[in-house]
């Protein structure tokens, strides 16, 4: 509902804000809406009381205004709704009317709800406690829901584990069954062997059958011979009959007797033959019976084998069914798991929904805050759901990958099977080659024996040679070790020399030694640099020599390794010597490496020594705490080198020193007041000069507006801040005035800096400058103060001289008049100096104490700012004119800066010269800077003392202060306008500089802005780590330097690297090309080269470690090493997280959130102004730092200058001795005042500030160290990832392992990136709810400005600054323009802007403002006291009763001091209590962090153990899968062998059938012979009976016998052919089985068999008459038709006839016409079961019926044939007539035989339509095993994911509890501190008013 109000309505003519004054809800990055974005006409914004500042309270008037505005808006909305309804009724009168009405009603409801929410906004403050209780209750509910979900998940896990155990048991049972099956296969193998032996016996029996056939052939021949003899006898009989008929009757008796004898002989012969034949027949029958018995035994064995195979098939089917049931159970488990996951998600979502509904109800009743918290919780849970969804998607992807891998594995399995077959073939070939190899081995043995003899001879000669070589190498090694030791000594000596030189440098850093010996230091530095460079060159040469030597040693190592391999077995002494040589070589390499390490360590020491020389300056320049600013003189000690006790002692000493300084300061103030009373007469004149100066500065400022460009405006803005810093340095300089020191050093610097070309022209100027230098070195301030007319004259003369120098040509520089006038002025000043030294000598007694002008400058800071601004304006105009006259001169890197910045940094550096150790290090300028800069410097130096004098003598009149305030306000307004323009120019300038830096880098190929950013980042990331070496702590000042530069223009780079490694970014756009000169690029490239060296070292180490492995074992070892490295990195990350959490907690409490709320409340102009002032401050500080670090060159120092300096020092010493005598007298008088003001030290207030600053610096140092470590780790991780990718490309690794390891590496890299971002920007996750949408919107709208987002100096949120109202800002600018940058305002702007807790931010802001108020109140008290003192002095002048007034003033002062002391003590005790409580809280937080880290480590150990267990389980599963695969392969091979045996048995059965047919034919032949014999006997009887009658009726039986004999011959020929074809087919089958191509040839063989049978039967049918066999002629078409239906090649392609084919093959012979039959196909759904090795048959029911009919018909035919044979053999048929009864049964018998054969052929054809099946097949068994493995893998993966998710839930719950606890503690502590500080503020505001009711104190900020 809130979102609908933000969008515009399409139906409205304009937006809602257009007519009613309502504004849409602004983006929530503005937490507090300003007045301009309020509710229309200046009404106060609606905000919670938490967000209102404590100083601002809302009245009833504000609420009334708000209510009236709401009423107006309500009325406007009603009118608008009315008109809209009318318009909608007019325009949309159709069916869409109700939709628009509903839309309008919803909008009305939305607006009403908004109004209700706004009205309930005030109740939020009252309901905060209820919200906390609700939040705690909600947390408990969430915990309860999580615990329920956890219990459910545990139950699911237990169920899953139980199911997994059951499945494992089932798998074990299946394995046992498989083992049983394997034992069964072994028994089958034994049976198969026995069958093969029996088959061999059968073959032998077949050879016996061949002998039988030979015997039968011989009998056939005998039969034919007998037939021929019968024919001859028949011919004889006929002849005899003829003769008998011819012979007469008398001869009949004789012929009959002969005939009787012949017949008797014939009968005897026939009887003998018959007996012999009967014997043979009986013998054959016995043989046939024996063969039949053998056949029956074999059939029994085959039947038993079939039964066993059926049992095995059943067992396999049972196993497959069990496996299918297991698969179903696994699927059910998966479905249960899915349901449980869905239930868990629903159970998580349901309580969340209920909670949301409850919170909505409570929200409508109570407040909106609870809803916000619940929405945050919902967002977290939603993010968790999103992460879980992503994990599920990733799991699905993994599952897909696993399936793909399984498919690949299957393909590989097939390929491996093929390879196995090929290996079998190769094994056969290898068996052949074994014999050849054995022969070759014998030959080789002989050769080896010969070679061994030769080697023994050679070995005898080798020891002498090796010993000589060894001695020579020992000498070389000794020489190398001696040279290495010498170089080590040289290195140690050089190190000692460097250390001595550095110690000397450190000891020489005192003031007097530097004054007297600056040229000696320069020469020492030059002499140190030259031997360093020589040493570096010599070291490089030695390093190259060592590399050559190491290369030679590596070659020698290879040679010796080869020798060691040859001599391993024979000579052990040589091996020991070689090992010694290798050990020596390793020692030498270690020495070389140690030398290199020493070299690098020396370089690091040198760099650290240089840094130590530089670090005091950086520490001083960027120290941000109040105490460090007050005590800049004592910055020579560094906190990091001391222990805690030493630091405490130092702090106590510093506090004592500050007290002494304060007391001396008060005493000096008193004396200065007395002296100022004496010089009252000159004050009137000074007022007029001051006002004239102010007018001049105003005029100069007006001219600046029109003349100077944008860059000069920016520089003028810099000058304001620089002048403040000058005043600060001046205030802290003690009795030695800052401008005097500056003038002195400037003269010294520029005296030697001018070019030698103008030496003649400038000789007079040099003399003048030396005079002025002596004048200023004598500290001529009192004379200048008393003589302002002299100052004005000197300034005018200098101005005149500079103008003349600018107008004239470069050769006309010297004007004699002006020079003479300047000399006269200098002489006058020197004369007056001698007179004024005695009167003003007291100011030089305590040169270390602060001058009273420090306090005056604090009081009148704004007036001084205006005056100094006018000075800077004048110098700018002058320098612009000089820039126009000399454009042709060349500048170096320092010339790129504007002259004003140079001047200001010079002033600051001179202020720094007051520190011990830096007094004589005067800054040097390059020769390119001209004398014009010197003159402008002199002018300003002459103008600043005059200005300060005016400020010092200014009376405290309210009118002048008001005028000055008005002028300052006008100037500030103009500055704001200029700064807006400067911002735009700065943005362009920074982008151009980044582009130029990207072009300057040689490695960056594309010149675009993101590339430049990347180059800059990578260039400076490695620098801090290299500077610090292996140290873990840095100087606190360097950290603050980094943090202070976060406000500079180049924000990103200064966050990473310290600014002394960067070239300064210029403020002027014109000098950009000059800025990017060779020196700046050199410094940039130097830092980058150091980084690249470090990275290359890591890369080379990584590349040297990578040797491409050939085997997987080496790869596994590599992966293991990488995993150990990963563990190490994870431990490092854990430690870094500890440090980061500690540091974040401290930073957020101390200073992390000061500026975010302030920047939101502040107007934009003030934010811009403070940002620019911060940037200019840090730029100036950096310039100062760089100039201090720049070494002095020997050209600057001149001999004359040194002599003049020495003379001046001698004179000053004499004067100091005089002054010290006077000071001893004055010391007793001043001692009483010192005791009075001793207790007013501000150090007591600032001790806490100092401790906080020190803690902050240490914490930020830790963050910086951890960031450097993160950078190094991230680089190392990237190199590791590259190396791992190269490993994967170089060798074959398991893709799953590689993917897992790659994911781990990427996760580690992501963690390191997150840590880097965290250390750079702080917490980015806990942003306010609006920041994500805001970022998305900005990314969409500002895609073109992507480079600016990285380079612009302004952050998206306003910068951290003091949040005060406009009045407070103005008063703050008038009263307390402190030059010191507050440590809290500069630290961590990004963390401060991103901290989400508004309440915490407001409390911390209040703490800061209260601390400010406290400091300001102390300062105002001091100011009031000073005013009282001054008024007392003024009244003392006019009054005579001085002692009475002074006593009263003394009493009031003492009472005030006592009161302030008590108040300060109370405040200090409160602050100590607060600090102790904070320390306790910090200790508690640390303890909780330690516990958390311990729990994390424990969890990591558990995770490692679980991972190891999972890996072990995976290995076990893989081994089991391999075993299962092996078993399945063995089962498949055994089944194939069984099928082959069965096929062989089938072939044997066919042979037996053929033999049965032969036996039947033989039986038939025997029966025929018997019949022939019987008929022959009958014929003989008939012939006897008809011998007398002579009938001729015996021809019919003979003719029938001839036909029968022909048929028998045809049958015999057919049987012989079939036997021959069977033998050939058998031989072919054996060959094909041996070759393994049986499957391809089966179809062809069956076709050949059918073709042969068809040809045989066709021949038979052609030979016979149609009349003799009518049934055969009818069924002949069926026979030919059967040839067209070809047999399939394999059982899987076994055909099934269609309906038409079945009809054509039916029993009805008439319907079986020659219809074309197509190739049949398998029955749908059954071909999956078809296999060769199946033990079941499958067919269509039609085919089965047809086969049944054929078999029944055949049975009937056989029964008829049996009847016919019985009738033929019965004695009744023999008794009947033989002629008629013989021919008819024989023809019937033959026709029935033919039909029986046709029936058998049809039956065989129908049998071919049956095919073998097995349910289920072996392939499915293997698939089932694979599926079980997949399911197990999925179950284990799901188990792991559940475990990981549970761990994540537990960790998040713990983190939530800990964060809530921490927030509660912080909130309680902040409430306590808030109350304490509020009491303190009340005390501070009430007490001064009670103490001074009459005095008018200035308005305080925040009042």
Swiss-Prot record:
<dbReference type="GO" id="GO:0035371">
    <property type="term" value="C:microtubule plus-end"/>
</dbReference>
<dbReference type="GO" id="GO:0005829">
    <property type="term" value="C:cytosol"/>
</dbReference>
<keyword id="KW-0112">Calmodulin-binding</keyword>
<feature type="region of interest" description="Disordered">
    <location>
        <begin position="244"/>
        <end position="282"/>
    </location>
</feature>
<feature type="modified residue" description="Phosphoserine">
    <location>
        <position position="544"/>
    </location>
</feature>
<dbReference type="GO" id="GO:0045893">
    <property type="term" value="P:positive regulation of DNA-templated transcription"/>
</dbReference>
<dbReference type="GO" id="GO:0008017">
    <property type="term" value="F:microtubule binding"/>
</dbReference>
<dbReference type="GO" id="GO:0048471">
    <property type="term" value="C:perinuclear region of cytoplasm"/>
</dbReference>
<dbReference type="GO" id="GO:0030054">
    <property type="term" value="C:cell junction"/>
</dbReference>
<protein>
    <recommendedName>
        <fullName>CDK5 regulatory subunit-associated protein 2</fullName>
    </recommendedName>
</protein>
<dbReference type="GO" id="GO:0031023">
    <property type="term" value="P:microtubule organizing center organization"/>
</dbReference>
<dbReference type="GO" id="GO:0001578">
    <property type="term" value="P:microtubule bundle formation"/>
</dbReference>
<dbReference type="GO" id="GO:0005874">
    <property type="term" value="C:microtubule"/>
</dbReference>
<dbReference type="GO" id="GO:0036064">
    <property type="term" value="C:ciliary basal body"/>
</dbReference>
<feature type="region of interest" description="Disordered">
    <location>
        <begin position="1349"/>
        <end position="1387"/>
    </location>
</feature>
<dbReference type="GO" id="GO:0000242">
    <property type="term" value="C:pericentriolar material"/>
</dbReference>
<dbReference type="GO" id="GO:0019901">
    <property type="term" value="F:protein kinase binding"/>
</dbReference>
<dbReference type="GO" id="GO:0005737">
    <property type="term" value="C:cytoplasm"/>
</dbReference>
<dbReference type="GO" id="GO:0007099">
    <property type="term" value="P:centriole replication"/>
</dbReference>
<feature type="region of interest" description="Interaction with CDK5R1">
    <location>
        <begin position="1736"/>
        <end position="1778"/>
    </location>
</feature>
<dbReference type="GO" id="GO:0045665">
    <property type="term" value="P:negative regulation of neuron differentiation"/>
</dbReference>
<dbReference type="Pfam" id="PF23246">
    <property type="entry name" value="CC_CDK5RAP2"/>
</dbReference>
<feature type="modified residue" description="Phosphoserine">
    <location>
        <position position="1676"/>
    </location>
</feature>
<feature type="region of interest" description="Disordered">
    <location>
        <begin position="1022"/>
        <end position="1044"/>
    </location>
</feature>
<feature type="compositionally biased region" description="Polar residues">
    <location>
        <begin position="246"/>
        <end position="256"/>
    </location>
</feature>
<keyword id="KW-0597">Phosphoprotein</keyword>
<dbReference type="GO" id="GO:0005516">
    <property type="term" value="F:calmodulin binding"/>
</dbReference>
<dbReference type="GO" id="GO:0031116">
    <property type="term" value="P:positive regulation of microtubule polymerization"/>
</dbReference>
<dbReference type="GO" id="GO:0090266">
    <property type="term" value="P:regulation of mitotic cell cycle spindle assembly checkpoint"/>
</dbReference>
<keyword id="KW-0963">Cytoplasm</keyword>
<dbReference type="GO" id="GO:0000132">
    <property type="term" value="P:establishment of mitotic spindle orientation"/>
</dbReference>
<dbReference type="GO" id="GO:0044877">
    <property type="term" value="F:protein-containing complex binding"/>
</dbReference>
<comment type="subunit">
    <text>Homodimer. Interacts with CDK5R1 (p35 form). CDK5RAP1, CDK5RAP2 and CDK5RAP3 show competitive binding to CDK5R1. May form a complex with CDK5R1 and CDK5. Interacts with pericentrin/PCNT; the interaction is leading to centrosomal and Golgi localization of CDK5RAP2 and PCNT. Interacts with AKAP9; the interaction targets CDK5RAP2 and AKAP9 to Golgi apparatus. Interacts with TUBG1; the interaction is leading to the centrosomal localization of CDK5RAP2 and TUBG1. Interacts with TUBGCP3. Interacts with CALM1. Interacts with CDC20.</text>
</comment>
<dbReference type="GO" id="GO:0000976">
    <property type="term" value="F:transcription cis-regulatory region binding"/>
</dbReference>
<dbReference type="GO" id="GO:0022008">
    <property type="term" value="P:neurogenesis"/>
</dbReference>
<feature type="modified residue" description="Phosphoserine">
    <location>
        <position position="1903"/>
    </location>
</feature>
<feature type="modified residue" description="Phosphoserine">
    <location>
        <position position="1673"/>
    </location>
</feature>
<dbReference type="Pfam" id="PF07989">
    <property type="entry name" value="Cnn_1N"/>
</dbReference>
<dbReference type="InterPro" id="IPR056273">
    <property type="entry name" value="CC_CDK5RAP2_MYOME"/>
</dbReference>
<dbReference type="GO" id="GO:0005794">
    <property type="term" value="C:Golgi apparatus"/>
</dbReference>
<feature type="region of interest" description="Required for centrosomal attachment, Golgi localization and CALM1 interaction">
    <location>
        <begin position="1736"/>
        <end position="1903"/>
    </location>
</feature>
<feature type="region of interest" description="Required for centrosomal attachment, Golgi localization and CALM1 interaction">
    <location>
        <begin position="1871"/>
        <end position="1880"/>
    </location>
</feature>
